């Protein structure tokens, strides 16, 4: 803290001014526990000449210590470590000389370090004792009549202490204590005891050898004058480095003012004498240690002082401490209740403001003078509109650079009953064999109890405190639809709305209706074929018992049924052929990566560790397998989702092939690539792979080793030397063939070596054959939506080609993950759609597709980078030089991330794919928009992601609006809460525009200076005007103020007139024909003033600007409102001001509420817990309307008079003798207008326990039912037609050949009977009957 010089301000006295105030007692504060100081004194064995041999003693006041330190002139002189812990030690000085003279202090060692130093002992030239230390202790409150102790501390034993007072030649008191300190007591303090005191000492045996006098000490008796006031300007809370002025003001002129800080009275004590009745103590550059409680007082020339001022707490901080907000009685309240939001923070003397998320202006204010332990923000008679997230902020009336931190928030929910929770299943909604499912019911606020319901069983109900319910599937009884609800502690009798239903399925997995229908048709066809075969055999062997008519009818029925089934199968096949094929991608768990590390580069096999890393962020466990048998399991070692498997020294027992898997929830990933350890001195052979070979294009071959920092070589079969060779590049290397030709075909392999042993090569990899084949052109590949997606999103890949009837393959990072059969599309095109229903963190990567027809393949498509966001923190996006760019100029968008070595992408709102990509080694990337035009205007954002692990990306940055224009858009100026402000209140003028990151300037008409808000990073700039007065009213405008050089034109905002009210008598406001009118009618609001020649202003509650102004010739203004609408409803008032003093307005008129309605809107009616009566249970009907202050009525069909009235809209219905069943409706009326009733609600039907049960009626059920009906009807028609034909057939057969038919039946009965000769008449007749056809 710096203070001005005495001529300019306050100066700190070198004397100690002591006030007899029990400061901490008067403040009600707890004394600060300070570390006790050690005591330092002198001893000498030469009483006549003590400076001949001096020893300094240092004593710890409260504990023993192992080390003591002696300081001289603030530098270390010597330190002593005694042989055992002790309270005191001695430092031998010897004879006092010029070199020994100086300031001495001592310290002792404690657990936390060195203690505070002792009081200063000054050794001066020989022949004079060091001056004592002098201070005062107050034992009682600082008022006349209290007792005071004056303490004088010397440096030798058995000294004589003398107390002197200014103006007296003789000492007023003396003492000879046994120690080194004397205590002088002044009892019953009076004003005569005021004055300046000093203390001196001398040795008893040398009475003429006096010490130097102590520092003078002023004794001021308080309470003779009234207490002053202490204020801080600009405010009591400031940032380090800012200036502060503490003003102490009293009622008497010409006094001396004193300022002190309670925490350090000796070092923070300042005096200032002025000719006025106030003194300013100026802090030029505040420091953190200036924080504390400050007091001031004043005294006259006779040291008669005033009472202490009130305590003023000064905060010096660069960041405000957080406020906390608490809702009482609960954050979940019912409609119509009152809620208090209690906001508290550690900073005193500052106002508080209550904000609601989504609203710019504060809802309520608490002035600093009105805040105490019982003060809160109140929300009375809450409605649905009060639901939201609230926060509390400090309300500063002065300007400071202190940063505002994030604040504690409270989410207030206003419900007729608590909102529904969320219900999820872990690990999935499908039962696995022998496994249970945990249903998790969750809500964001404290809950008393959760309840789980099972829709298939009405009596089923489980309760849980933590919301977890374990469901087993014993005998298949766990499947079904579940929902949950909860109740809170403040309303234990009210259960919340039910959650969305969640269906649990059996181990068979997910079944679609198409699959069920196809399988049912196939099974029916097989059954029909078997049945037809049995009928034929039955007729063949058992026809003796069956008449021909019955057999024929049965066969006909079977044939017709088969005909319908075959037709249905053909229709399904044709439909499937016409539709474009869409294949759901069952994403495998990402394949992990396996490699080896060692800390012995020259002999890596001496200590080898295998590492397994998964690209997924949800890996629970890793498994390492050797030769597919033995395994070791371990958990991830860090957030990088990798695990170590130490093998130690490699021996023969370690040789083999290693794989690793990652375990996620209930799924195991594919195995990693094999790592084969073949010996103790042989490196494992690497793995070689390549992308598809295309003639004339670049080809990359990937060689993957197993250790870090390896060198690589590429070999081609038939050549002795390596084709390409790379130095130590890592665990993998890429060899490039610039242009693939016929000469490049052949078998390739690669080898590796360690960096320290470049001549020790590994085994060669397995050979890879490169063959150039004739190929179709590459397909067109894209995503239907943006390739930058959030977890859980739905992604569809579209792979298309002009060729027809092709099969498609989808690749991820070069590996095949899905395929599609030939697509029977319309002529001229063929396509396949690959679908990821819910994207996970591990699904990111580079996707591509190919198509093929028999042995001919296409070239790979261009890759699509799928980036899954929300894994890393979001970056920041800035525009350089600024977000407003002149057409034809360039702008740089810098995306600043958190991690280094990432890949950045720039996105524009409305664009399907990212605009630009950048891979950088640092943590930021610059995107250049060159020669921008109007089409480049829009919102931009950016992300960063890692390319080595499934393209896991960050959150999207905050959008940045780029304007390409030659003129800044016009900002908008408005006042909050209104441009009509009462005298003495606060108002904020907001300059808001669409351009972000630009400062604003506020202009007032008639003034040359402007108020500026620099560096605004939000949409708006705030210009607060506190304690508004007549000088604040007038016309205002604002404009942008960019902090970069630009030729873009700047245009001013609208003009805002700021009116100050409370300077004239209030007017009256009336409505003609009345305060309630029907929509479309006309209304006139009449504002009657007290003075002529006035301008009248009409105001509406919630509007920030006046609705209309009029300058009538008389005392009244008529505001005509033609064809009013519903939005004209509200609370109106008016003011007026004189032409001679514009903007100095009257008080507000009394408020007038206007209703524009012919009939209030109809309410809603619902039933709780359901619309079905259960045994012994009542139903509560809840009628809710949009307007407050109403009375509800419930009506029951069949009853002439209304059944019940209610103010809260709840009606309890019982079902005694079945009288509660039926249709209900409700309506309401306004209490202010009891003759106007609303429209009735939609009817609601209550049914009994045996009432109709709702059946699921889906499109699939309708289709299947219709198909069955058609088949049965058609079969019935065919059978009826055939039955009608049979009598004619029978008659015709009897008339023509009845005898032959009888013979045929008899011979059919004798068929196969033994003993019948082949050439007998019977057999002959039989052969004849078989050859004759039966007429039909």
UniProtKB/Swiss-Prot annotation:
InterPro entries, sorted: Ig-like_dom, Ig-like_dom_sf, Ig-like_fold, Ig-like_Receptors_ImmuneReg, Ig_sub, Ig_sub2
Entry GO terms, CC: extracellular region; membrane
Signal peptide: 1-28
Glycosylation sites: 53, 338, 374, 381, 607, 747, 798, 846, 939, 986, 1027, 1082, 1147, 1223
GO molecular function annotation: activin receptor antagonist activity; inhibin binding
Membrane topology (Extracellular): 29-518, 581-1336
Domain Ig-like C2-type: 38-122, 137-222, 226-312, 321-408, 419-500, 589-677, 686-760, 777-869, 873-958, 965-1060, 1065-1150, 1161-1242
UniProt keyword terms in alphabetical order: Congenital hypothyroidism, Disease variant, Disulfide bond, Glycoprotein, Immunoglobulin domain, Membrane, Receptor, Repeat, Secreted, Signal, Transmembrane, Transmembrane helix
Transmembrane domains' residue ranges: 519-539, 560-580
Chain spans, region Disordered: 1308-1336
Listed GO biological process terms: immune response-regulating signaling pathway; negative regulation of activin receptor signaling pathway; regulation of DNA-templated transcription
A Pfam family reported for this protein in Swiss-Prot or TrEMBL: Ig_2
Expression sites (tissue/organ): Highly expressed in pancreas, testis and fetal liver. Moderately expressed in heart, prostate and small intestine. Expressed at very low levels in brain, thymus, ovary, colon, fetal lung and fetal kidney. Expressed in muscle. Isoform 3 is expressed in pituitary gland.
Residues on Cytoplasmic side: 540-559
Keyword Repeat assigned: yes
Bias type Polar residues, positions: 1317-1328
Disease / disorder: Hypothyroidism, central, and testicular enlargement: A disorder characterized by insufficient thyroid gland stimulation by thyroid stimulating hormone (TSH), resulting from hypothalamic and/or pituitary dysfunction. CHTE patients have delayed testosterone increase at puberty with normal testosterone levels in adulthood, normal testicular volume in childhood and enlarged testicles in adulthood.
Oligomeric and partner information: Interacts with INHA. In PubMed:12385827 does not interact with INHA; standard receptor binding assay. Interacts with ACVR1B; the interaction appears to be ligand-dependent as it is diminished by inhibin B and activin A. Interacts with ACVR2A, ACVR2B, ACVRL1 and BMPR1B. Interacts with HECTD1.
General function of this protein: Seems to be a coreceptor in inhibin signaling, but seems not to be a high-affinity inhibin receptor. Antagonizes activin A signaling in the presence or absence of inhibin B. Necessary to mediate a specific antagonistic effect of inhibin B on activin-stimulated transcription.
Protein name per Swiss-Prot or TrEMBL: Immunoglobulin superfamily member 1
Annotated source species: Homo sapiens
Gene label: IGSF1
């Amino acid at each position: 803290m710096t203070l001005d010089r005495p001529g300019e301000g306050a100066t700190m006295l070198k004397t100690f001014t002591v006030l007899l105030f029990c400061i901490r007692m008067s403040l009600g504060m707890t004394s600060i526990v300070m570390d006790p100081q050690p005591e330092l004194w002198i001893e000498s064995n030469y009483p006549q000449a003590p400076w001949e041999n001096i020893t300094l003693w240092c004593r710890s006041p409260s504990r023993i210590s192992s080390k003591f330190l002696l300081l001289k002139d603030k530098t270390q002189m010597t330190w002593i470590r005694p042989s055992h812990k002790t309270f005191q030690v001695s430092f031998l000085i010897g004879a006092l000389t010029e070199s020994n003279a100086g300031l001495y202090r001592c310290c002792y060692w404690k657990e936390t370090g060195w203690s505070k130093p002792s009081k200063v002992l000054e050794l001066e030239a020989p022949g004079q004792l060091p001056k004592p230390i002098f201070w005062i202790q107050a034992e009682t409150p600082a008022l006349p009549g209290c007792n005071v102790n004056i303490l004088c501390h010397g440096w030798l034993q058995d000294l004589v202490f003398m107390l002197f007072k200014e103006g007296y030649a003789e000492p007023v008191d003396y003492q000879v204590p046994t120690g080194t300190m004397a205590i002088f007591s002044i009892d019953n303090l009076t004003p005569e005891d005021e004055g300046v005191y000093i203390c001196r000492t001398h040795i008893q045996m040398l009475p003429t050898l006096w010490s130097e006098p102590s520092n003078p000490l002023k004794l001021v008796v308080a309470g003779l004058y009234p207490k002053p006031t202490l204020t801080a300007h600009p405010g009591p809370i400031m940032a380090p480095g800012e200036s502060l002025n503490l003003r102490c003001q009293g009622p008497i002129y010409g006094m001396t003012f004193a300022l002190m800080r309670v925490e350090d009275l000796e070092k923070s004590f300042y005096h200032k004498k002025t000719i006025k009745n106030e003194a300013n103590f100026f802090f030029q550059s505040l420091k953190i240690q200036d924080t504390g409680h400050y007091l001031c007082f004043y005294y006259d020339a006779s040291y008669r002082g005033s009472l202490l001022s009130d305590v003023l707490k000064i905060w010096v901080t660069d960041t405000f401490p957080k406020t906390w907000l608490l809702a009482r009685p609960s954050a979940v309240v019912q409609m119509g209740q009152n809620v208090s939001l209690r906001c508290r923070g550690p900073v005193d003397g500052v106002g508080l403001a209550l904000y609601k998320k989504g609203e710019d202006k504060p809802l309520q204010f608490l002035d600093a003078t009105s805040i105490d332990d019982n003060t809160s923000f109140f929300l009375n008679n809450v409605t649905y509109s009060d639901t939201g997230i609230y926060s509390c902020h400090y309300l500063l009336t002065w300007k400071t650079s202190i940063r505002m931190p994030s604040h504690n928030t409270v989410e207030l929910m206003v419900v007729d009953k608590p909102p529904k929770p969320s219900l999820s299943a872990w690990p999935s909604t499908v039962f696995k064999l022998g496994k249970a499912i945990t249903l998790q019911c969750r809500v964001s606020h404290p809950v008393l109890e959760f309840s789980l319901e099972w829709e298939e069983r009405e009596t089923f109900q489980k309760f849980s405190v933590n919301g977890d319910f374990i469901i087993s599937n014993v005998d298949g009884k766990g499947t079904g639809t579940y929902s949950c609800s909860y109740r809170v502690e403040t309303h234990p009798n009210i259960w919340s709305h039910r959650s969305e239903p969640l269906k649990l399925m059996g181990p068979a997995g997910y079944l679609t209706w198409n699959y069920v229908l196809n399988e049912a048709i196939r099974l029916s066809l097989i059954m029909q074929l078997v049945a037809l075969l049995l009928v034929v055999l039955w007729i063949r062997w058992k026809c003796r018992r069956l008449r021909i008519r019955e057999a024929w009818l049965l066969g006909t029925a079977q044939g017709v049924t088969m005909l319908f089934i075959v037709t249905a199968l053909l229709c399904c096949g044709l439909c499937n052929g016409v539709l474009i094929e869409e294949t759901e991608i069952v994403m495998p768990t990402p394949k992990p990566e396996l490699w080896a590390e060692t800390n012995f580069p020259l002999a890596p096999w001496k200590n080898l560790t295998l590492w397994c890393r998964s690209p997924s962020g949800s890996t629970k466990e890793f498994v390492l397998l050797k030769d597919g048998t033995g395994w070791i399991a371990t958990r991830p070692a860090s957030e990088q989702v990798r695990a170590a498997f130490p093998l130690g020294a490699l021996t023969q027992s370690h040789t083999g092939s290693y794989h690793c898997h990652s375990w996620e929830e209930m799924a195991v990933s594919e195995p990693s690539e094999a790592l084969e350890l073949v010996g103790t001195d042989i490196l494992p052979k690497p793995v070689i792979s390549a992308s598809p070979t295309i003639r004339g294009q670049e080809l990359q071959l990937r060689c993957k080793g197993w250790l870090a920092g390896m060198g690589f070589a590429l070999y081609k079969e038939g050549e002795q030397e390596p084709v390409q060779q790379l130095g130590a590049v890592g665990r993998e290397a890429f060899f490039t063939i610039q242009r693939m030709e016929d000469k490049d075909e052949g078998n390739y392999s690669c080898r590796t070596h360690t960096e320290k042993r470049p001549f020790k090569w590994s085994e060669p990899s397995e050979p890879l054959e490169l063959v150039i084949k004739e190929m179709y052109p590459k397909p067109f590949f894209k995503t239907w939506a943006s390739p930058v997606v959030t977890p859980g999103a739905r992604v569809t890949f579209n792979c298309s080609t002009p060729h027809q009837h092709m099969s498609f393959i989808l690749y991820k990072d070069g590996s095949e993950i899905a395929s599609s059969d030939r697509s029977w599309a319309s002529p001229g095109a063929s396509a396949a759609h690959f679908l990821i229903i819910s994207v996970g963190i591990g699904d990111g990567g580079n996707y591509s597709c190919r198509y093929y027809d028999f042995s001919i393949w296409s070239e790979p498509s261009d890759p699509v980078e799928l980036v899954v966001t929300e894994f890393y923190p979001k970056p920041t996006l800035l525009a350089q030089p600024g977000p407003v760019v002149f057409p034809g100029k360039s702008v740089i968008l810098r995306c600043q991330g958190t991690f280094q070595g990432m890949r950045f992408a720039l996105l524009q709102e409305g664009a399907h794919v990212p605009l630009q990509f950048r891979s950088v080694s640092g943590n930021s990337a610059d995107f250049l928009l060159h020669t921008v035009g109007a089409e480049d205007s829009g919102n931009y954002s950016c992300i960063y992601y890692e390319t080595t692990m499934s393209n896991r990306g960050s959150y999207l940055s905050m959008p940045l609006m780029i304007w390409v224009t030659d003129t800044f858009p016009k900002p908008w100026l408005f006042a909050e809460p209104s441009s009509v402000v009462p005298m003495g209140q606060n108002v904020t003028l907001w300059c808001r525009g669409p351009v972000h990151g630009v400062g604003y300037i506020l202009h007032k008409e008639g003034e040359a200076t402007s108020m500026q808000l620099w560096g605004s990073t939000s949409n708006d700039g705030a210009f607060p005007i506190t304690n508004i007065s007549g000088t604040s009213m007038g016309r205002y405008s604002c404009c942008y103020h960019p902090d970069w050089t630009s030729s873009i034109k700047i245009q001013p905002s609208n003009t805002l007139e700021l009116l100050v009210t409370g300077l004239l008598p209030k007017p009256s406001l009336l409505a003609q024909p009345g305060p309630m009118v029907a929509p479309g009618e006309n209304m006139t609001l009449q504002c009657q003033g007290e003075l002529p020649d006035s301008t009248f202003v009409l105001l509406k509650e919630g509007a920030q600007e006046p609705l209309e102004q009029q300058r009538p010739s008389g005392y009244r203004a008529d505001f005509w409102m033609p064809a009013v609408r519903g939005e004209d409803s509200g609370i109106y008032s008016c003011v007026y001001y004189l032409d001679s003093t514009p903007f100095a307005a009257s008080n507000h008129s009394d408020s007038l509420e206007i209703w524009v309605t012919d009939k209030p809107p109809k309410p809603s009616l619902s039933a709780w817990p359901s619309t079905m009566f259960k045994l012994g249970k009542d139903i509560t009907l809840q009628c809710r309307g949009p307007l407050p202050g109403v009375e509800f009525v419930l009506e029951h069909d069949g009853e002439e008079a209304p059944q019940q009235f209610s103010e809260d809209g709840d009606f309890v219905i019982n079902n005694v003798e079945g009288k509660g069943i039926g249709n209900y409706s409700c309506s309401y009326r306004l209490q202010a207008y009891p003759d106007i009733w609303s429209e009735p609600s939609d009817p609601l039907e209550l049914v009994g326990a045996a009432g109709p049960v709702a059946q699921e009626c889906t499109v699939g059920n309708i289709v299947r039912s219709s198909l069955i009906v058609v088949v049965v009807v058609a079969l019935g028609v065919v059978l009826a037609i055939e039955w009608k034909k049979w009598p004619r057939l029978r008659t015709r057969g009897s008339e023509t050949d009845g005898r032959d038919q009888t013979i045929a039946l008899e011979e059919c009965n004798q068929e196969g009977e033994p003993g019948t000769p082949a050439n007998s008449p019977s057999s002959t007749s039989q052969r004849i009957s078989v050859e004759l056809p039966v007429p039909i």
